[in-house]
């Protein structure tokens, strides 16, 4: 059976149910309290050049512009979501907000991004973990490192496989992998692929050790990491939209 690939994930993100899910969130939820807290702490300059990877339907990029950040550029590899992001920006009177279709593992293919450098880079709502394959995720980290200015920050989120509430589930999953009985479409321990009302979703759930190793291997210096509920008490709407996650901050 064919493994989950980047093309699989792109097709899933272009599906109507997934596009509707992210578009509704962009219109109705906006910036989380935790996102605002960590972004304004590590990127306090409202004139900073900010690149948002995996911008989806524009939820974060549009909210940052409304918060006063003047130079935000977003990209996503889903053409359907990029179109929705542009529509949202236009509806909010931000037609000059720039969105590109681009692949985080191949930023050199998008000259408007590849030819620039940024003060900070964001990859929120666990977007980096929706890239199948650890080496591919490391490639994305290297690409983001390349377009980030020295001293600039990377802020991203992941799930946390070390969460004690998940221990029993991961113990069972480890037994399946030991017997070779895991989902044959998954390539690495920590991968999940599931279907719900919002469509198909691939997600890699790392432990902290994995992220520390990946940052070190790609030139980033770890600065901070905190669970979302340590940063802010989110609204019920946000908690219904997204599980708790770990925020990571790294510096070039």
Functional labels for PLM-detected ranges:
Residues 1-45:
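Conserved class I S-adenosyl-L-methionine
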Residues 54-56:
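Class I SAM-dependent methyltransferase "Motif I" SAM/SAH-binding loop
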Residues 59-108:
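Class I SAM-dependent methyltransferase SAM/SAH-binding core
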Residues 110-120:
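A short acidic, Gly/Pro-enriched loop at the edge of an enzyme's catalytic core
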Residues 119-135:
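A short SAM/SAH-binding and catalytic strip from SAM-dependent methyltransferases
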Residues 138-150:
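A short glycine-rich, Lys/Arg-flanked "PGG" loop and its adjoining helix->strand segment in the class I
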Residues 155-215, 224-232:
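SAM-dependent methyltransferase
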Residues 236-252:
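Core SAM-dependent methyltransferase catalytic element
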